[in-house]
Amino acid sequence: GTLARYSAKNYGVKSLGVTIAEKQTEYAMGKIADEGLVGKAEVLCKDYRDIPNQKFDKISCLEMAEHVGVKNFQKFINQVRDLLNDDGVFYLQIAGLRAGFHFEDLVWGLFMSKYIFSGADASMPLAFVVKALEKAGLEVHSVENVGIHYSATIKRWYDNWMKNRDSVLAAYGDRWFRIWEVFLGWSVIIARQGSSTCFQIVSNKNLDAFDRTRWFGEDALGERSRPHTPGKTPSKPRAEA
């Protein structure tokens, strides 16, 4: 629920988050209440296929799409398209792989499938993701490969895991601790060397009426990077030569 809270608090939006984790939902709604954001931010405990049928100006998907699986990936992207306003923007952050056959990448994938994320087989090369977006009628605006940043983030996760060794062992036992120690440590190396990565993709509906000038100019840049001051109406983006 952090993104839902942050966007509502700093950008003045009405934000809706969705997760299948009951404990996460309870935690997020408690934080929303503590920060006085009830009515501005909300987190629902739902399967993505049960998201209320309404329209959104912006949709963000943070490393959830790979868990949809290859079989359901196109249906998921189609659903995002249907939930997005015609002038809306879709931000997709998804774990991915480099293209081509690489033996270590195969071993990594088999390990992940068996021990960590069974069925999460939609961590794919970029071409697979872009093809699904375009097939759904979306237009890719920008793509950034943040694999090195991803590696640095996972290193923090690994450090936290090792710092909490005793409490994890007490709660889950040695086998579970060792599996995740190997997984997180291996993930740091895999992401750093380029075997796995993370793509950040911004897209919009591929419509003639979509205003593509919104991506340019100081104001448009601020739309993405500068927090909103509550009570102040953000300026409209302007085109610059």
Language-model features, listed with the residues they occupy:
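Conserved SAM-binding loop of SAM-dependent methyltransferases across substrates and taxa
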Residues: 1-12
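Conserved SAM-binding motif I beta-strand of class I
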Residues: 13-20
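Conserved SAM-binding loop
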Residues: 28-29
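Conserved SAM-binding strand-loop segment of SAM-dependent methyltransferases
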Residues: 35-50
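A short acidic, Gly/Pro-enriched loop at the edge of an enzyme's catalytic core
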Residues: 49-60
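Short catalytic micro-motifs in class I SAM-dependent methyltransferases
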Residues: 63
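A short glycine-rich, Lys/Arg-flanked "PGG" loop and its adjoining helix->strand segment in the class I
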Residues: 74-89
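Substrate-binding/catalytic lobe of Class I Rossmann-like enzymes that use SAM or dcSAM, i.e.
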Residues: 96-211, 220, 224-225
